[in-house]
């Protein structure tokens, strides 16, 4: 942001009636985070010293959702138009700073476009973001005389001739704070809507002989607002398409870019292959030669080089070292870590557990609060019984242990290295090195047994 432009105002007080939702409009998610958060992030990327958020409808929930943000909260108790919203923010302006005005429901506005807008703002004048549309219906029109911007006329107030203008107002502008205060104080609501229009400051500035410079966005999607769920879904697709394009150009192989969702940040190595319907959330790192199967969900995780995640696997807040294989239909819950070449197979769930180098849990297993050494085999149907209804307890399994199928390990329990646990065993006591442990009921054979037969009705 330029030296003089140090504050941003984000207008986010609208009700969002056409969303048909109890959730404030600006909190609806785009790419996994609230629309308004995208705008806040862009403001911060510009280096804004102050971000004033004008809020109203659903204010408590908005404050709660954004409680970790460094914002100046400005209440607009009544929604009487964009001009009225800015009047609430005006007392917070420093006289010598420029004010950039953004909107909480215009989430895709880019920092590069705003940098150009800030650069063209004339001294004492206004920098205005406009766009040329084939169909400008619904937008305020830019009125010019001899090529100079003289005002903005809203659709409902425009004449038939003015409605033919195809240069439209995006609502985004930058002006000096002291000038804005003066112009805002002169607004009236003498219009069809009975509202105070921020756009009227353009005509007021022109009357004072101030220059208004207009620039266009780099992409039209940057100025598109959201009034309903259809528009939100359209922007979601635009955003995802842009993310997919960037990944493809960076060397990630998306087998179908139209069926990939990035809802966070993806750091990747070389020769990564991602199949269809994969969702990336939070901060995810994929090493070299990683393969992600169809239908996987990865959230806040690190996947080491040469690892393969098979279809329909969920990995959250977990880490894999080099050469791991996981899935299909596996779930790694928060706190799971796989060492080099560890294997977690189908219908295996891990939580707060470590699986050592070369160890395997092939199928139908729950490993919770477990620390498992290297080269361990976990048989099908094994369960670490880690919860007594009040507290969680740890299971520790040493290197080279063989755990037979259908084993229950009742924590807290320690299985020393080299031990063997027979199938169907319930382990309730610690096991020493190289011991064989079996606990089963005696198998009984009853000759001539006849099954019960239902009586005929």
UniProtKB/Swiss-Prot annotation:
Organism this protein belongs to: Photorhabdus laumondii subsp. laumondii (strain DSM 15139 / CIP 105565 / TT01) (Photorhabdus luminescens subsp. laumondii)
Lineage: superkingdom: Bacteria
Known EC number: 2.7.7.23, 2.3.1.157
One term of GO molecular function: magnesium ion binding
GO cellular component, as recorded: cytoplasm; membrane
Binding-site positions, acetyl-CoA: 380, 386-387, 405, 423, 440
Protein family: In the N-terminal section; belongs to the N-acetylglucosamine-1-phosphate uridyltransferase family.
Signal peptide coordinates: none
Protein name per its UniProtKB record: Bifunctional protein GlmU
Binding of Mg(2+), residues: 105, 227
Keywords: Acyltransferase, Cell shape, Cell wall biogenesis/degradation, Cytoplasm, Magnesium, Metal-binding, Multifunctional enzyme, Nucleotidyltransferase, Peptidoglycan synthesis, Repeat, Transferase
Catalytic activity: alpha-D-glucosamine 1-phosphate + acetyl-CoA = N-acetyl-alpha-D-glucosamine 1-phosphate + CoA + H(+); N-acetyl-alpha-D-glucosamine 1-phosphate + UTP + H(+) = UDP-N-acetyl-alpha-D-glucosamine + diphosphate
Location of this chain's protein in the cell: Cytoplasm
Region (Pyrophosphorylase): 1-229
Subunit structure of this chain's protein: Homotrimer.
Lineage: Bacteria, Pseudomonadati, Pseudomonadota, Gammaproteobacteria, Enterobacterales
Cofactors required: Mg(2+)
